[in-house]
Amino acid sequence: MFSLQDLCRKNTFFLPSDFSKHTLHLLGLYWKGHGSIQRIKNDGVLIEHDLLLSINEALILAGEEGNNDVVQLLLLWEGNLHYAIIGALRTEKYGLICEYHSQIQDWHVLLPLIQDPETFEKCHDLSLECDLSCLLQHAVKYNMLSILVKYKEDLLNVLFRQQIQGLFILACENRKLEILTWMGQNLPIPDPEPIFNIAVVTKDLEMFSLGYKIVFEYMENQGLFHLTQVVRMVMINRHFSMVINKGLLPFVLEILKHGGHVNRALSYAVTQNKRKILDHVVRQKNVPHKTIERMLHLAVKKHAPRKTLNLLLSYINYKVKNVKKLLEHVVKYNSTLVIRILLEKKKNLLDATLTRYVKDSTYFRVKEFMQDFSISPEKFIKIAVREQKNVLIKAICEDIWENPAERIRNLKQIVCTIKYESGRQFLINIIHTIYQSYSLKPEEILKLATFYVKHNATTHFKDLCKYLWLNRGTESKKLFLECLEIADKKEFPDIKSIVSEYINYLFTAGAITKEEIMRVYALEYAMY
């Protein structure tokens, strides 16, 4: 059975304001010098119905006063004993500390909770097996700069200097910039390189920049050492390689601020295929044409991918001045991709220029351009078809192919290479105007008729059939049967209808038999 005191101490109650001091003593809810104390929710206490504190804040206060009764009450309310110890350390209430000493397994656990350096050091001193070196390590870890300042002379002692490097690395790993700055200004750091390595791994640009300040300013001001230009560039180039490999553009720019060479940055960006860095440096630093070509040679040597080569070529508008040097690299390193890109680009540029000529210039200027760049008539005609320039097409056809039959044969071949329907029909119309303008041999007309059928050129085919019937009559039987077969296979109903009409004429004239018709298209002409 619980006592009233146990119930009040273990549970959350609102105490009546008229409880006497004697009653509060009996309940164990009186804090000497403060008044009543009661638990509020899970993590707070209310003192004398007025002051609200967290349980751990109250433990620090009780520890400072050495009030074990209140400490026990607050621990009952799930407070953290460490805070009572911290409070006791502040005011050196070692009696209270001795009371709970056995419950603390490792005094280092308390250190992150302590804000002031004196208490921090007192707490660390309770770890009897630890020495000054351990204290300094924890001072770095928990940002207690004043402790380092206090023991500066010890750190400068010849016997202790060997530990400076370890403390420096620890400060880097924990990213304690204030401590790093102080160490750079006051201590002889044997090797400052870890600050750069760790800054890159953690992507901490501020710490990376501080590293250069330590090396080039603080350490030189201390007279510790002076970097020769060669050693300085070796270090900076190593940093270039490290940060570009990870694609850290802001770090690259930071290195350039501290003496890094643009060409070196470009070289690493090219060899490691970091196009974002390459593009930014080229554009921001106005890199000259000659340097870009050197980077292009390097890219060829390293077999850089297409995107990197294209990017470099774009800076010089795909115009390589030192072609001989480029070809030397291509042959020496068996890296031909750049040549393919240049040839492709030349083709694209020629196509674009020719298109502009077709749209805006006379035939004579177009012809001159074609001759200068050895452009085939087929390429010109395809572009002219796309731009619907029938006059230009007729002009070049007459200029190149004097024989109308040859003209039609070549245009028919071009029709077969055009992939879009409107382009094919446009060129077929031009072919038909040539047919109408000249007298072709019968065999050429027959070939043209089958060509029209294959491309479903209904109107032109009908016109041609009329001519054939009027001029050749029943001699066209074989052609009509062939056209019927093609139209049937390709399912061109309009063509089939036209052919059927002329087959009817042939049948009526006795030039064709029912069996011949049935062999070609039995179902359609079963009536015969």
Curated annotation (Swiss-Prot):
Subcellular location: Host cytoplasm
Disulfide bonds: none
The UniProt record lists the keyword Glycosyltransferase: no
GO cellular component, one term: host cell cytoplasm
Keywords: ANK repeat, Host cytoplasm, Host-virus interaction, Inhibition of host innate immune response by virus, Inhibition of host interferon signaling pathway by virus, Inhibition of host JAK1 by virus, Interferon antiviral system evasion, Repeat, Viral immunoevasion
GO biological process: symbiont-mediated suppression of host innate immune response; symbiont-mediated suppression of host JAK-STAT cascade via inhibition of JAK1 activity; symbiont-mediated suppression of host type I interferon-mediated signaling pathway
Main location: host cell
Induction profile: Expressed in the early phase of the viral replicative cycle.
Mapped ANK repeat ranges: 129-158, 261-290, 292-322
Domain of life, source organism: Viruses
This protein's record includes keyword Repeat: yes
Pfam families xrefs: DUF249
Record's subunit section: Interacts with host STING1. Interacts with host JAK1; this interaction leads to JAK1 degradation. Interacts with host JAK2; this interaction leads to JAK2 degradation. Interacts with host RELA; this interaction inhibits NF-kappa-B promoter activity.
Function, in words: Plays a role in virus cell tropism, and may be required for efficient virus replication in macrophages. Interferes with host NF-kappa-B promoter activity mediated by TLR8. Mechanistically, inhibits the phosphorylation and subsequent nuclear translocation of host NF-kappa-B RELA subunit downstream of TLR8. Promotes the expression of the autophagy-related protein host ULK1 to degrade host STING and inhibit the interferon response. Also inhibits JAK1- and JAK2-mediated signaling and thus negatively regulates the IFN-gamma signaling.
Family: Belongs to the asfivirus MGF 505 family.
Name of protein: Protein MGF 505-7R
Protein source organism: African swine fever virus (isolate Warthog/Namibia/Wart80/1980)
